[in-house]
Amino acid sequence: GAIDSKLDWSHNFTNMLGYTEPQFTELMRLYLTIHSDHEGGNVSAHTSHLVGSALSDPYLSFAAAMNGLAGPLHGLANQEVLVWLTQLQKEVGKDVSDEKLRDYIWNTLNSGRVVPGYGHAVLRKTDPRYSCQREFALKHLPNDPLFKLVAQLYKIVPNILLEQGKAKNPWPNVDAHSGVLLQYYGMTEMNYYTVLFGVSRALGVLAQLIWSR
């Protein structure tokens, strides 16, 4: 559809995606804001800064950033969390007890795997972007089964990771939550999640490019 200059970026974007639910527009405002930039050390932001430092065209700088985001270690994290949560729910069922969930987490770690959505290369506390999404979920979808599972993991996983002693940061990151919110509002096409990330990051990294010049 056509761009409506009276609406903000997020509202126009959700309209073009075919969504009319006001809460989804509110979620997209949150999502696009918290994913727009994150220091300069992650792959996509760093790449855009690096290419832009050569005075390359901003579109080329952003395209380079998206090539970095295409890498599974960077751009697929929230999808991997959602797949893991779905598998967990399938194996242990809904309304799982804390004890059974602890056993599942320990079995995951003892088999040499990690708990997706936990840990961060820089942060040493709960990712504030996770906290923003948690507040949104508590307000709009407190009884959603997947959100309840995410909230339950938040109570359990950090203590287990601290007890294990290997994680420098046992707290959840932004990817631990975003997929659950998108699924709730009907955006089930997980392959599109990285595109959302890219749309968001455009605002942050290109603003940085302008400031740098």
UniProtKB/Swiss-Prot annotation:
Per the UniProt entry, what are the Gene Ontology biological process annotations, in alphabetical order? carbohydrate metabolic process; tricarboxylic acid cycle
The pathway to which it is assigned is: Carbohydrate metabolism; tricarboxylic acid cycle; isocitrate from oxaloacetate: step 1/2
What does the entry list under GO cellular component? mitochondrial matrix
**Any coiled-coil ranges, and where?**
none
Gene3D superfamilies, sorted: Citrate Synthase, domain 1 (1.10.580.10), Cytochrome P450-Terp, domain 2 (1.10.230.10)
Family indicated by similarity? Belongs to the citrate synthase family.
Name of the protein described by the UniProt record: Citrate synthase, mitochondrial
